[in-house]
Amino acid sequence: MFCVQCEQTIRTPAGNGCSYAQGMCGKTAETSDLQDLLIASLQGLSAWALKAREYGIIDHEVDSFAPRAFFSTLTNVNFDSPRIVGYARQAIALREALKAQCQNLDASAAVDNPVADLHLVSDDLGDLQRQAADYAPNKDKAAIGENILGLRLLCLYGLKGAAAYMEHAHVLGQYDNAIYAQYHKIMAWLGTWPADMNALLECSMEIGQMNFQVMSILDAGETTKYGHPTPTQVNVKATEGKCILISGHDLKDLYNLLEQTEGTGVNVYTHGEMLPAHGYPELRKFKHLIGNYGSGWQNQQVEFARFPGPIVMTSNCIIDPTVGAYDDRIWTRSIVGWPGVNHLEGEDFAPVITQAQQMAGFPYSEIPHLITVGFGRQTLLGAADTLIDLVSREKLRHIFLVGGCDGARGERNYFTDFATSVPDDCLILTLACGKYRFNKLDFGDIEGLPRLVDAGQCNDAYSAIILAVTLAEKLGCGVNDLPLSLVLSWFEQKAIVILLTLLSLGVKNIVTGPTAPGFFTPDLLAVLNEKFGLRSVTTVEQDMQQLLSA
């Protein structure tokens, strides 16, 4: 086992990465190794998908499957070894079908890629784990060195984050052939074990640029189906009655669940990254979308244990449900998996609803505590002139984007302390689950404009980017000249690709934490600092002073 893709990876003087019987996330060495084998299988599939396009063959099943299966290897998504192997077998079957189509048109059709003809050696998981050793991401570390390995992993993990957003967009009916062709090109190239530093750096920026397009179609998918988010108050306390909790990012799953629970007497609560759903008109029209429950994903083993109903996980993040003894009432959907728990392959939530009706639910309603969400792209752009007016009248000094992933590390208290230390004449724009560090606090307003503005899920960084570009255009300056600072927390691969997206767009002087990615070497950090001004958090006082004086 070697996995260094998330923020909580093991860090020692000898090196970084989880490499024992189990990773810090709870992933076993077996599952981790089989994920390496799956990734190699998907790289081979992409190599042939790219070749097939030369013959005018575009297989939509391949295009939809490839990023979805890659998404299953993202942190805290799928811990189920047999399902990982199933994805690998499906990748190989799709690859062979594509290969046959190409060779029917051209008998000499071939792909020069070391994983283009990969086959699984056995049905036995132990045999497959041994085969996976040939595809361990650090297998040639001694030959290429830590810097090249770090850049490879930056590209691989960044592309994995983009694949997750591609799947979210595809579920909502969004497809762009140019994006998928670019995805296959990059994925196939990474399967050749590239070792050129400049090429890898260029690739990382290409992934960031591609992801901007992915976020654009995801935004289109969400707003076309569910309307543009508008500011909405959400109760974060319990309401008496039967209940279901839904977590993750998949708004379509939430919509289907709301439709199927309507009139049943079962209330639906959002959790984690599902919180922004309350801002969408077509979702909040369901009156039994009753509120939001819990805090950051890392607290779920305590909070889920206390929730008196079933829980549906639509995407990341799931962690061991046996710890809180709620494994009999947690349900996984789509690419999510945990051994031994119920899995919903389709969109029928009937068994979940039945379970909810059989459980006690909340015995009484708590005193409501309302927070405001729903500052989507359209709302943010509508406020652009107000922001400019406040700045011109010196009522608004600075905007801080404080957001990103949450996690368990104690140093993450930095982000709570930073938000509460922001001066009263400054605004906080937030997104993703990092907001749970401070989103239940009262920050007041500036002439009626809330000082805490919740822009949505992690992918809604797109809205923040569009706002920044709009403000810069209206003020006749560059984005980096705005009174705007980005203070980002990271945990997994979606955050990595958001960072690459921002860097590829030329955004500079981003502050990130609580630690640097484990695959970043000092040399890579120095390059990113020199080129983009990217740096790690220090202390709240020092960072605040530096950002306000920039």
Swiss-Prot record:
Family according to the record: Belongs to the HCP family.
InterPro entries linked: HCP/CODH, Hydroxylam_reduct, Prismane-like_a/b-sand, Prismane-like_sf, Prismane_a-bundle
Reported cofactor(s): [2Fe-2S] cluster; hybrid [4Fe-2O-2S] cluster
Residues the record lists as Cysteine persulfide modifications: C405
Top-rank lineage group of the source organism: Bacteria
Residues where [2Fe-2S] cluster binds: C3, C6, C18, C25
Catalytic activity: A + NH4(+) + H2O = hydroxylamine + AH2 + H(+)
Cross-referenced Gene3D superfamilies: 1.20.1270.20, 3.40.50.2030
One GO biological process term: response to hydrogen peroxide
PANTHER family linked to this entry: HYDROXYLAMINE REDUCTASE (PTHR30109:SF0)
GO CC annotations on file: cytoplasm
Residues the record lists as binding hybrid [4Fe-2O-2S] cluster: H249, E273, C317, C405, C433, C458, E492, K494
Taxonomic lineage from the root: Bacteria, Pseudomonadati, Pseudomonadota, Gammaproteobacteria, Enterobacterales
Alphabetized UniProt keyword annotations: 2Fe-2S, Cytoplasm, Iron, Iron-sulfur, Metal-binding, Oxidoreductase
Cofactor: record remark: Binds 1 [2Fe-2S] cluster. Binds 1 hybrid [4Fe-2O-2S] cluster.
Function: Catalyzes the reduction of hydroxylamine to form NH(3) and H(2)O.
The protein's name: Hydroxylamine reductase
Membrane-spanning segments: none
Translocase in keyword set: no
Keyword Transferase attributed: no
Chief localization: cytoplasm
